[in-house]
């Protein structure tokens, strides 16, 4: 469906996708290997989506940065920064060079998630 949309105009997808794509995207990858959100199948499907012509904007700009967007309310997870990066902005690959900023605002509280931000250049 996204590929079909992308044929007409570039696509931007934002949301809680409930998948930590790579080991860098969660605090404890070894102990979560078979848990929902980090199963091999989910991660493979996420890779398939990216390989279909889409870019994970945060990871594109910050390939080695360990930053999370969600923490369980249990076990003082946010206080311990034992989180997951499951909130994303994905863009069509043809928008990749227009990405100016992709951030996760861990300083903002009020939910078990924090806001994610994307700034793209306009095509003026």
For each predicted feature, which ranges?
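Metal-dependent phosphoesterases centered on the DNase I-like endonuclease/exonuclease/phosphatase
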Residues: 1-82, 86
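Short, charged/polar surface micro-motifs in flexible loops or helix N-caps
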Residues: 55, 95-96
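Short active-site-adjacent structural elements
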Residues: 65-68, 98-99, 112
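Short proline/glycine-enriched turn/loop segments at secondary-structure junctions
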Residues: 77-79, 105-110
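Short hydrophobic/aromatic beta-strand or adjacent loop that forms the aromatic wall/cage
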Residues: 85-87, 113-117
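Hydrophobic alpha-helical positions that pack around
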Residues: 90
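Low-complexity, intrinsically disordered Gly/Pro/Thr-rich segments
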Residues: 97-107
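Short, basic, low-complexity termini and linkers enriched in Ser/Thr/Gly/Pro
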Residues: 121-124
